[in-house]
Amino acid sequence: SVGLSVTELLEIYRYHEPQISLPSESAALLLHLRRKNIRLGIISDGRSRTQRNKLRALGLDWIEDVVISEEFGSEKPCEANYLYFEKKYPDYRFTYIADNLKKDFVAPNRLGWRTVCLKDDGRNIHSQNIEIAEVQKPQFIIDKLTDLIKVEEKRL
């Protein structure tokens, strides 16, 4: 026993400053996209403070359009989270990258977005070894974020 209640332990977990970082090639790709004025956004489930702490730790707090379920009032796969981007950027095409096969791809598939699953490298909390319905399947699966370049070449 550590002498803390479950509530206290949850508070520590939810509000700690995580010690995480992006792989260097992922950070370089995002910087490259930013320099090319390609709009990036984030859709994330979870508590606002927890998710914002993660974004800050990853150096992604520069991304303007962030939809966090606690702030937005709906969770994936609710289409409202995705429609935020369609309403704000009506003339854009969207590519959605995620890793949770159970819920991440349902709404963007229905909306006609390009969907890409970042394959689990063994550290993901969401199992990718599951049976899923067709609507849950991404159109593409990549091993690392830099493989996104190959996916986008297929769009042209």
Question: What do the predicted segments below correspond to?
Answer:
Residues 4-7, 27, 31-34, 48-156:
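Asp-based, Mg2+/Mn2+-dependent phosphohydrolase catalytic module
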Residues 10-41, 79:
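Short, acidic loop-to-helix structural element flanking the phosphoryl-transfer center
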Residues 44:
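Conserved phosphate-coupling serine/threonine residues in phosphotransfer and NTP-handling enzymes
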